[in-house]
Amino acid sequence: MRRWKWTIRLGGALAAATLGVGLLHLPAARPLLTRLGACPVGRASASEIEEARRIALRSLRGDAPAPARPALGFELERTTLDDVRGWARARAIACDESRESTLLVCRRVQADALESDVLQPIDEVAFVFRVRDRRLVNVTTLTAGVSPRHAADSFAAIAAALSSSLGAPEASRLPPQRWDGTRPAFVRYRYLDYVADVSAMQLPGRGIVMREQYMSASESGS
């Protein structure tokens, strides 16, 4: 749990960098911080957290449905909690379950266990499940201490894979050839039923931190 606390702080920092500090301080966006794990949820129930996520997504959705919804090899709104438990058990991956079994956080996940192009083990993968049926609605990864070269190569590969599935992003800033992580890199997609964010930046004491997030944005999935 202590490790997940620093993940919360890192995830919040990356969210602010990629989504914009101004947006995160709008009243309607405050629940977004909860969804991203950037602020504590206290004693909020799983249903209350899900409602906060639903409100936040209203400001993030695009207008058109996504041509695909890549999610690191999982299927949004189809993959179940039991499916992910089985995936983790088959690979001897340690996971913690919380929030009334709507949050599963797995640690030290090999990149080849996921459809991810990150070039080193992933520190933590968080799976969020819909309250009513425990189906997957959000998968987020966080990897710290990535070398500039590996981060740039990983980022380019992830961006290329998303572009192949989804086309041009809504917004992006790819790492330049000589990149040290001080200027954040990001790729952002916004659809009526799907949101994807990939980001990388240098953070004090953690080196370059990479984050991938793939989320259902449909009314049924949010």
Regions found by a protein language model. Give the residues of each.
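N-terminal secretory signal peptides that target proteins for export/translocation
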Residues: 1-2
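Non-cytosolic coordination micro-motifs
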Residues: 5-9, 17-104, 138-222
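N-terminal post-signal-peptidase region of extra-cytosolic proteins
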Residues: 67-70, 107-116, 122-124
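Extracytoplasmic
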Residues: 122-126, 134-136, 184
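Hydrophobic/aromatic beta-strand elements that line small-molecule binding cavities or substrate pockets
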Residues: 125-130, 196-200
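Generic detector of bulky aromatic hydrophobic side chains
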Residues: 127-130, 135, 151-154
